[in-house]
Amino acid sequence: YSIKIIDGIYPDRPVMAFHTMEDLELMLQRRTRGDITDLTINDEITNRPYQKMAITNICEWLNAKHRRGLLVMATGTGKTRVAISLVDVLTRNNWVKNVLFLADRTSLVNQAKRNFAKLMPNMSVCELSAGGEKDFNARLMFCTYQTMINYIDAEDKRFSAGRFDLIIIDEAHRSIFNR
């Protein structure tokens, strides 16, 4: 059997599991959302022209009803800050509520979590790769690919099929996340 989701925004597509009632209610709300119109970029997060251009281009791409995008930037050009600004713009425009940040190494996960927490202090964060107590209701989740694979394969499903509105994959070229 196969499960497909038809949300009225994007073409129908296969999904791995059924969406929860909360996921479906959020989808219904999203049907009436408008384009991303408030492209105000916080200069304290990103202030370089090429970073702002990247954020604007991604928002225009999403407004054109594309579900996926790829941002390729050289080392040291502020990819994490661009991701933070993008999350900021998308949350202010009510396009995303829950974000998953994936990376191939724990050090990248830790660094991203620290930067997001510092630059978006009003958003709750949780690092799933770390030990200790976890806030599974946090709006920003951070983990390695392998940690998320373990959560997907676990008997006790922590995350529904529609839990994350935005998934950011750092170092995608190294990704083993082929599901």
Per-region residue spans from a language model:
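ATP-dependent helicase/translocase motor core
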Residues: 1-98, 107, 111-123, 136-140, ...
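Short acidic low-complexity segments
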Residues: 125-135
